[in-house]
Each structure stands twice: as C-alpha cells, then as structure tokens.
Amino acid sequence: MRVAIVGGTGDFGLALARRLVEAGDEVVIGSRDAERAREKASEVGAAPGAANEEAVSGVDLVVLATKADAAIATATALAEAIGTTPVLSVASDLRSTDALSLAQRAQDLVGGPVVAGLHSLAAGKLAHGRPDEDAFVCGDDEEAKALALELAAKVVAGRALDAGPLSRARALEGMTAVIVSLNKRYKGHAGIRVTGLP
C-alpha cells in the first residue's frame, strides 16, 4: 500500500510511518515544511518526504495525523490535492464539545471518503514496536474502511476491529481522553484489548 501521512513529522505520524515501513508499505511523509519531511523520512526509511500537497499525490490512503487544532484547516487546504483518495483521520480533540467528530467534519471538506481510527494508540508505544492492543476503525465507506483496517492490522500486535459507521468516530476520539486520564492517574501506559470476540 502507498500511504501519505500528513503531519508525518509529529510524534504519532512518525511512529506510524516507522511501523508501516517495517511492514513493507511505501510511506510518504508530508509536512508544511518539505525539508523537515525529507529529514524525518530518511530517519525511518520512508520514501522521500515532501510538502503536504505533493505527499498526497498518487497514494492509496491519506492519513491525517496533524494535531487536532490543525486537522480541519489542513483538510480544507488539501481538499483539492487529496481529491477522491480515502482519508484516515487519527486526530483527537480532547477539549471539543462539538457533537461532530473531527473525522465527520473533515468528511464535509474533502471529496473522498473519510474514516476514523487508531485513537486508542499512544505515539510513545507505537514508536517502539507494535503495541499489544487492538486498534479501532469506523467509517461509512466499506472500501476505505477496509484500507484503514489493513493499515491498522500492520501496526498493532492485537486486532484491527471494525467499530461501525463514521458516527462512532466521536466515541473513538473520546477514547484518547479516557486513556490519557488513566495513564495520569495510575502512572502507566494503558492500551485497549477487547475480549469476548471470536
């Protein structure tokens, strides 16, 4: 799979790139700063990094891995360059009181299908290997969701689970806040593993 990671120079984007390169995917790291994207791409063995607009060209999946406060502006700025390519939104807005998730808001801006997922994964754990936990993906477009689930299965030691339609994205984004709270309270590195499924 050829994957563009927009925001790929940040902690989560870079950790995700590292795992996908290890899995044999062709990864293009995108950034507002093309030189920084090239530097980070060489660190993880990814394809040459590029400015975001160039990075999203000719890929199978675009991962929107910017910080939450930049996700919507980035989706807006890249809408034309992304075209109809599927987008996986991994950002979580921990302070939002908006009824719609970031992924749902992004869906209104880009021409292709948007799915959401990987919100329960911590950048720090992902940077050091495939976490022994499950990854969740939701979306309305089955083909786009299948691509995101394929990606998710490559980066966790647990399972990639279909969490339903895109309307579940708000709940998935909220998982981040719960995990952060648990880690602060118990001074740990919590992750999620679902039991009782076949």
Locate predicted features.
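Residues that mark the start of a beta-strand
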Residues: 2-4, 86, 134
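Rossmann-fold NAD(P)-binding glycine/threonine-rich loop
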Residues: 91-129
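General beta-strand structural signal in soluble alpha/beta enzymes
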Residues: 50, 113-119, 160-163
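Active-site-lining helix/loop region of Rossmann-like oxidoreductase modules
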Residues: 125, 133-198
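NAD(P)+-binding Rossmann beta1-loop-alpha1 motif at the extreme N-terminus of oxidoreductases
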Residues: 1-43
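Hydrophobic Val/Ile/Leu positions in short beta-strands of Rossmann-like dinucleotide-binding domains
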Residues: 5-6, 64, 137
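Rossmann-like NAD(P)-binding element
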Residues: 52-86
